[in-house]
Structure formats: structure tokens, C-alpha cells
Amino acid sequence: MKKNFRVKREKDFKAIFKEGTSFANRKFVVYQLENQKNHFRVGLSVSKKLGNAVTRNQIKRRIRHIIQNAKGSLVEDVDFVVIARKGVETLGYAEMEKNLLHVLKLSKIYQEGNGSEKETKVD
């Protein structure tokens, strides 16, 4: 994922937390705030309580990969922060993807069938 698709600055994180709305399930919390750009931006937060640096980085890589795969179905004019909760470190990729897409659907950031999935015609 390119750097212009990431929330990096502390002031941006604080603005999203303060002014944005939150949605959650058992494994993830998502804060979102509309932006004036023509693309979404994502920030990631993984606590040190979830494991050592290797584990935390693996979680972040998986989250970025899930978002990259769902890129075509994500709303464009929003900044959002994904916070991983305790228990995420034990999930496999498929279960993590299911949980993350669930909370993104709750927040209406992810809209199924709105993107790069190709429709197949049956004759």
C-alpha cells in the first residue's frame, strides 16, 4: 500500500479519534472520519500487549494485505484507524480477514460488490 494511503501524523490520528465515529467487534475497533481527498487513508494501531515486535508487525502486514485486497470496495473519501484488540494474535489469516471486513461493513467503509470483483456471466 502506498504511503499516501496511510495516516502517519499524530495530529491526524488525534483528529480521527476526537472527531470521528467508532465501530467495533470483538477483535477490531475502527475509527473513521471523512476527508477532503479523493482516496481513503488508513492508520494501524497494534498494542505492545499483543506480543513482541515480530507478532505485532505480522498483524499489521496482514491487516494491510486485507485492506489492499479490498481496496476496490472501500469508500474513497474517508480516513480510518484500525485498532487490533487482544486475541487477534491467535487468529489465522482467513479468520482475521472475516473479522476485519465485518467491522468495516458495520462502519460502511467496505461495500461488497462495489469494486474490482469481476461479474461472471452464465449463458
Curated annotation (Swiss-Prot):
Q: Which GO terms describe its biological process?
A: tRNA 5'-leader removal
Name the domain of life. Answer: Bacteria
GO CC, alphabetical: ribonuclease P complex
Q: Name one GO molecular function term.
A: ribonuclease P activity
Recorded catalytic activity of this chain's protein: Endonucleolytic cleavage of RNA, removing 5'-extranucleotides from tRNA precursor
UniProt keyword terms in alphabetical order = Endonuclease, Hydrolase, Nuclease, RNA-binding, tRNA processing
Pfam short name (any one): Ribonuclease_P
Keyword Hydrolase listed:
yes
Give the family, as the similarity comment puts it.
Belongs to the RnpA family.
Q: State what this protein does.
A: RNaseP catalyzes the removal of the 5'-leader sequence from pre-tRNA to produce the mature 5'-terminus. It can also cleave other RNA substrates such as 4.5S RNA. The protein component plays an auxiliary but essential role in vivo by binding to the 5'-leader sequence and broadening the substrate specificity of the ribozyme.
What is this protein's name?
Answer: Ribonuclease P protein component
From what organism does this protein derive? Streptococcus pneumoniae (strain Hungary19A-6)
Task: Quote the gene name from the UniProt entry.
Answer: rnpA
